[in-house]
Amino acid sequence: MAAAISAAVSLPSSKSSSLLTKISSVSPQRIFLKKSTVCYRRVVSVKAQVTTDTTEAPPVKVVKESKKQEEGIVVNKFKPKNPYTGRCLLNTKITGDDAPGETWHIVFTTEGEVPYREGQSIGVIPEGIDKNGKPHKLRLYSIASSAIGDFGDSKTVSLCVKRLVYTNDGGEIVKGVCSNFLCDLKPGDEAKITGPVGKEMLMPKDPNATIIMLGTGTGIAPFRSFLWKMFFEEHEDYKFNGLAWLFLGVPTSSSLLYKEEFEKMKEKNPDNFRLDFAVSREQTNEKGEKMYIQTRMAEYAEELWELLKKDNTFVYMCGLKGMEKGIDDIMVSLAAKDGIDWLEYKKQLKRSEQWNVEVY
């Protein structure tokens, strides 16, 4: 249960260097043996019937206790045939004007009817019909707010959405249906919402865990929800005392999402929060190679490998699928030094819920 919280959130927009929003709130698994009978001098043998009960008792089902915060989680409360209608409260561009693409932070009302958790997703059904005259299909988006929302009253849900616009092979400009629908919303506009869904990216229960977050672009969404709960909120039943380490990869510095928020968290929690950016078009490593997220991680390779050997280290990866191979390449050589097959070890981490991936 969340107690009173207070946090200043800076969301840069194209019209001003930052939008400062003051947020304060009050919260929200028989064997019958052979028998002889003596009668005078004649012995009468009575052969006993031997029966054996071969029915086996059903095996006891062992329920594996999850290391994640799954208690009371709700999934698929709202389905495509009966979605929840949310209303847009806020829609702010959070990338600079010179960024390669627009990303928007969108806040919807839920009136407490969509009980999501950090790490879950919701679906959005855009208005209109497709070329076949049928309603558009839903698109899933990772939730970018903590369970009590940006306003701390458990009545909103936030998304981080990049506007999809590209030129196809025929030279035509193509716009993503749902992303453009969302990025064009004005306060007061409605949107059909489904879900919540997902358990893969739920936070670990252990408040002393090491949580390594690897995100590219809008893959930052679930990690913003994690970090708000850890560092911007106060809860009676949860206080994070571990280490949160965020690696965020983007093409340009004007594409860094929620930068001011994260820097404020780091300033106030220097012992519990580490923050590393990888800006591929502006930064290089000592070899002159572009600074992708795996390039930045390579600078801390030995330290990361030591953390991955611990039972209370959890890795979460969200964003572009391409970063997976680069991260594997780093870990293969490190694990080999200890005589460990990295790909097999990663499977063990997945089974123990310590390696969690949501890429696209």
From Swiss-Prot:
Keyword field contains NADP: yes
State the organism of origin: Arabidopsis thaliana
Subcellular compartments? Plastid, Chloroplast stroma; Plastid, Chloroplast thylakoid membrane
Q: Keyword Transferase, does the record have it? A: no
What up-regulates or down-regulates this gene? Answer: By nitrate.
- Look up the EC number in the record and give it: 1.18.1.2
Keywords attached to this Swiss-Prot or TrEMBL record, sorted alphabetically, are:
Chloroplast, Disulfide bond, Electron transport, FAD, Flavoprotein, Membrane, NADP, Oxidoreductase, Phosphoprotein, Photosynthesis, Plastid, Thylakoid, Transit peptide, Transport
Amino-acid positions noted as binding NADP(+) in the UniProt annotation, renumbered to this chain: S142, K162, T218, V250, P251, S280, R281, K290, G319, L320, E358
Q: Which residues carry this modification: Phosphoserine?
A: S179
| Residue sites binding FAD per the record | R139, L140, Y141, S142, C160, V161, K162, Y166, V177, C178, S179, T218
Q: How does it assemble?
A: Heterodimer with LFNR2. Interacts with PGRL1A and PGRL1B. Interacts with TIC62. Component of high molecular weight thylakoid LFNRs-containing protein complexes containing LIR1, LFNR1, LFNR2, TIC62 and TROL proteins. Interacts directly with LIR1 and TIC62; LIR1 increases the affinity of LFNR1 and LFNR2 for TIC62. Binds to YCF54 in chloroplasts.
In which pathway is this protein known to take part? Energy metabolism; photosynthesis
The effect of disrupting this gene, in the record's words, is:
Plants have a reduced capacity for carbon fixation and prevent the association of LFNR2 with the thylakoid membrane. Accumulation of MgProto monomethylester (MgProtoME) but altered tetrapyrrole biosynthesis (TBS) associated with reduced YCF54 levels and lower MgProtoME cyclase activity.
For this protein, the record's PANTHER family field holds: PTHR43314
Please report which protein family the annotation says this sequence is part of.
Belongs to the ferredoxin--NADP reductase type 1 family.
Q: Which residues form the FAD-binding FR-type domain?
A: 81-203
Main role? Plays a key role in regulating the relative amounts of cyclic and non-cyclic electron flow to meet the demands of the plant for ATP and reducing power. Probable electron donor required for the MgProto monomethylester (MgProtoME) cyclase complex reaction to form protochlorophyllide, thus connecting chlorophyll synthesis with photosynthetic activity.
- Modified after translation how? May form interchain disulfide bonds with LIR1.
Among the record's GO biological process terms, what is one? Answer: photosynthetic electron transport chain
Name under which the protein is recorded: Ferredoxin--NADP reductase, leaf isozyme 1, chloroplastic
Q: Got a GO cellular component term for this one?
A: chloroplast envelope
The organelle transit peptide extends over 1-49
